Design a protein with these regions (language model features):
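Conserved class I S-adenosyl-L-methionine
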Residues: 150, 169, 183-211
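Helix-to-beta-strand junctions that scaffold the AdoMet/dcAdoMet cofactor pocket
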Residues: 146-147, 181
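Conserved S-adenosyl-L-methionine
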Residues: 247-256
Length: 266
């Protein structure tokens, strides 16, 4: 494991009080609708989606803090944590937090901005980490993107072949999360929520043959408020129970509908 960056000073907010300035902006909220979509309608969709995402991310942060009780004495790992802004917004300490990601550029930002330790992942089947190395492992909206080697999956147009690749990769990823964690919190969007969260298209996009999915996502990427690659496979509640048999499954709801699934081992 390669830790980088010196420890930063303790933040001003306290655990249990998520910092909205840090966690309240989804990555795509600033996307600009193309000229093919009326600007007013595009802006409305963008604001609505950003608001719902902010609400869910805030409630998720509280659930994480309330159920796992992460502390300054815990070794904490965020798998797929990118630049580290999410945990930086909800945890008041830095020196015991590590961000793991495949992108070295975001790891540099996580280290230099927040003083987090970093682990470079290479996309291989096994994490470069010891068994039960971390007291707490956090992983949000990542496992649905673990569908196989990046240089292979975009060339797969057959639905059954892609599903087989994705199931195997997701099972391995879940096993690695469980292997390195004493306690964990793993969240993923629910397959049957009315709006598919990556494309912001109706959920039936995930039920179409993969060949059609690729074409539609490519088309809407040029004429819609979001651009997304066809690298994801959303999970069901049953699948999450199978992937994390030692966890409690908690359902995040929005407007009464299941929006995300969270596997918690406290």
């Amino acid at each position: 494991m390669a830790g980088t960056g010196a420890n930063s000073q303790r933040g001003q907010h306290t655990a249990g009080t998520p910092d909205m300035a840090m966690i309240g902006s989804p990555r795509w909220a600033a996307a600009t609708p193309s000229a093919g979509l009326p600007a007013r309608f595009g802006n409305f969709l963008r604001r609505t989606a950003a608001r719902s995402s902010t609400d869910c991310r805030t409630r998720r942060a509280r659930l994480f803090l309330d159920r796992l009780h992460p502390s300054a004495t815990d070794e904490i790992l965020d798998v797929g944590g990118g630049k580290g802004g999410y945990l930086a917004g909800i945890l008041p300490y830095r020196g015991n937090v590590t961000i793991a990601d495949v992108d070295p550029a975001v790891l540099t930002i996580a280290a230099e901005t927040y003083g987090f330790g970093t682990v470079q992942l290479d996309g291989s089947a096994r994490f470069p980490l010891a068994d039960k190395q971390y007291d707490v492992v956090f992983c949000s909206s990542v496992i649905e993107h673990i569908t196989g080697p990046r240089d292979v999956i975009f060339g797969i147009a057959d639905s059954a072949e892609f599903a087989a690749s994705a199931r195997a990769a997701q099972a391995n990823f879940a096993g690695e999360l469980r292997r390195v964690a004493k306690r964990y919190f793993v969240q993923t969007p629910y397959k049957y929520f009315p709006i598919e969260p990556h494309s912001f298209l109706p959920f039936f996009i995930v039920l179409l043959p993969r060949r059609w999915q690729i074409r539609l996502l490519d088309f809407f990427g040029r004429h819609w408020i979001k651009t997304v690659q066809a690298d994801f496979r959303l999970l069901t509640i049953r699948e999450m129970r199978t992937l994390f048999p030692d966890a409690e499954i908690v359902l995040e709801r929005y407007c009464g509908l299941v929006k995300s699934i969270v596997a918690i081992k406290a």
